[in-house]
């Protein structure tokens, strides 16, 4: 297995690309920037299965020439958005451990930030393996155990003496992200291998400083408002009113990249794995 450490310049180019989709949602553009940069080292073509497809906008940004794509999403509304996008030839409303497609029928599969949310991980990976042709690959991004370990907001609130509020914030954060599988890197590799895959490429994403600031932004964004909804519904229009924000936030990410000291220990990972039988 090759470990690919991303140069800072590639992460920043990733931000330049994804900020066009999410210019005023900083936690989303930050995380997606690392994923985008990682996928530049992957190649998918032919008939493609997108597992947990959502609305297809990010898929189209990463793989603009892909034109034979089938999506799967268990959420009816997300699946409908995928159908309306024009990205997919077909979108199944189905759980990923029960994909209504034939054996050995896809050249590649893609699962962006979806596997960690799925309750039947071994079944999902086995189903992706079943659908892939021999030699086919899965490109995917996932979170690791550090995603929880480095969550700053509950820790800071607890340090201020508000233990009950800290526990509530942590629960809300985990409930929102529905993290069924915040595995270690070794745990992810073992899961892929159990399903019959061999891991060819691992790209660590979001080391400690990037991850800590990302988690703080994301946690604040999703804090529940007393009046209903999330704090993010107040933050986004505030940021949207400033046309300088996307470029200014790029400078912040650049500073965080300069601060990193360990690029292997990260809260996320991007993998390329291959079906070997």
For each predicted feature, which ranges?
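A short glycine-rich, Lys/Arg-flanked "PGG" loop and its adjoining helix->strand segment in the class I
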Residues: 122-137
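Short catalytic micro-motifs in class I SAM-dependent methyltransferases
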Residues: 113-117
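A structural helix-start
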Residues: 118-122, 146
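Acceptor-substrate binding/catalytic loop of class I
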Residues: 171-187
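Conserved N-terminal segment of class I S-adenosyl-L-methionine
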Residues: 1-98, 102, 263-271
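A C-terminal cap/extension of S-adenosyl-L-methionine-dependent methyltransferases
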Residues: 156-157, 190, 200-277
